[in-house]
Curated annotation (Swiss-Prot):
Protein keywords: Ribonucleoprotein, Ribosomal protein
GO biological process, one term: translation
Quaternary structure, from the entry: Part of the 30S ribosomal subunit.
Listed name of the protein: Small ribosomal subunit protein uS10
Length: 103
């Protein structure tokens, strides 16, 4: 796997879970002898919603809700076979989306 790179993109609503998962991935990759660049925090995507409080009248009375999506990006440079096996066996918490690309 010479001159290849693994790009990992993490996505979660809770920043603590995503930071914990990123730390586990970095620790696993460094333990197997790979070089890790990151985790790089990407801009947080914020979706805001306005919902009417009353089902009938009072149009001006609304609740405002938001969903924040946190993203992290990291590259593993020159991964070994042990690195790939360790990453496949890694158990990450529920609520963290993982996207892996081999470049």
């Amino acid at each position: 796997m010479q001159n290849q790179k693994i790009r990992i993109r993490l996505k979660a609503f809770d920043y603590r879970l995503i930071d914990q998962s990123a730390a586990e991935i970095v620790d696993t990759a460094k333990r197997t002898g790979a070089v890790v660049k990151g985790p790089v925090p990407l801009p947080t995507r914020i979706e805001r919603f306005d919902i009417l409080r009353s089902p009938h009248v009072n149009k001006t009375s609304r609740d405002q809700l938001e969903i924040r999506t946190h993203l992290r990006l990291m590259d593993i440079v020159d991964p070994t076979e042990k690195t790939v096996d360790a990453l496949m066996k890694l158990d990450l918490p529920a609520g963290v989306g993982v996207e892996i690309k081999l470049q």
